[in-house]
Amino acid sequence: MSVVNNRVALTNLVSMEALTTEEVLGLINRGSEYKAGKVVISDHQKDLVANLFFENSTRTHKSFEVAEKKLGLTVLDFNADASAVNKGESLYDTVLTMSALGTDICVIRHPEDDYYKELVESPTITASIVNGGDGSGQHPSQCLLDLLTIYEEFGRFEGLKIAIAGDLTHSRVAKSNMQILKRLGAELYFYGPEEWYSEAFNAYGTYIAIDQIIKELDVLMLLRVQHERHDGHQSFSKESYHQAFGLTQERYQQLKDSAIIMHPAPVNRDVEIADSLVEAPKARIVSQMANGVFVRMAIIEAILNGRNKNS
């Protein structure tokens, strides 16, 4: 990975740890340029991309598709339910097939953690891999759009007090964000049910009760309660979770005037956040969705830069 002619060039994008700080900031800046309409878009019709989603998705899937179409790529139709996956074909063989057909980029979401390792290590698969989310592992494109949203607001990361709240153990968003925000100099706090907290997170921030820190926060990043990963073993109701850990009207009133609220969505209204606050003045949830298109344009461009450099 490198920066060529002031533009990021990537072979794959599978995790935030694999990016240098220069590459992270370069992608954020490029996303901002796309958003401002400052980029003259080249003709990429000859470049083929396949979005291989094996978990349900609205924002990530459609955001990538919009980004790809804005860049002029040819987007191959893929429906996992109508593919050979239903005949028992493995992810590896699906990607191997797409690569053999001449696909340049595969954007993949899959329930298995680290699914991408055998793909990027394969000597036969020539398609570049973009991780659209792997199980409870990583979600690099969501992390980058979150960073753009924060940077638009504050113009910096250094010294910001940021709390990541909720279903921490099961959240790929949390894992990607805590790693890079720590590296960029933010002061991180975590809160949520203790059974959803891992001591491994202590390397990045401090576990604390929300009511002890809420008045000092610059960013409150709420996480979706991932019911599908709990096997029905939650120890509390939606109402009790909201009162203990959610953003209630009372907690909202305690936030600084300059503070912002974020959530990767989909939102469980009246669980992580009061229904009336999803579009409140401090909320940036809709901005995150919009920024996703521009950051993903920057990601796809960076992959194409990397492929052109290596060809």
Curated annotation (Swiss-Prot):
Biological pathway: Pyrimidine metabolism; UMP biosynthesis via de novo pathway; (S)-dihydroorotate from bicarbonate: step 2/3
Binding site for carbamoyl phosphate: 59-60, 109, 139, 142, 265-266
EC number: 2.1.3.2
Keywords carried by this UniProt record: Pyrimidine biosynthesis, Transferase
Reactions listed under catalytic activity: carbamoyl phosphate + L-aspartate = N-carbamoyl-L-aspartate + phosphate + H(+)
Chain residues that bind L-aspartate: 87, 172, 224
Biological process, per Gene Ontology: 'de novo' pyrimidine nucleobase biosynthetic process; 'de novo' UMP biosynthetic process; amino acid metabolic process
Domain of life: Bacteria
Class of the enzyme per the UniProt entry, highest EC level: transferase
PROSITE patterns documented for this protein: CARBAMOYLTRANSFERASE
InterPro entries per the UniProt record, alphabetical: Asp/Orn_carbamoyltranf_P-bd, Asp/Orn_carbamoylTrfase, Asp/Orn_carbamoylTrfase_sf, Asp_carbamoyltransf, Asp_carbamoyltransf_Asp/Orn-bd
A cellular component term, taken from the record's GO annotations: cytosol
Classification via SUPFAM superfamilies: Aspartate/ornithine carbamoyltransferase
Keyword Transferase attributed: yes
Claim: Transferase is one of the keywords in the record: yes
MF term (GO), any: amino acid binding
Family classification: Belongs to the aspartate/ornithine carbamoyltransferase superfamily. ATCase family.
Function: Catalyzes the condensation of carbamoyl phosphate and aspartate to form carbamoyl aspartate and inorganic phosphate, the committed step in the de novo pyrimidine nucleotide biosynthesis pathway.
Subunit-structure text: Heterododecamer (2C3:3R2) of six catalytic PyrB chains organized as two trimers (C3), and six regulatory PyrI chains organized as three dimers (R2).
NCBIfam families: asp_carb_tr, PRK00856.1
Name listed for the protein in its UniProt record: Aspartate carbamoyltransferase catalytic subunit
Organism: Streptococcus pyogenes serotype M4 (strain MGAS10750)
GN (gene name): pyrB
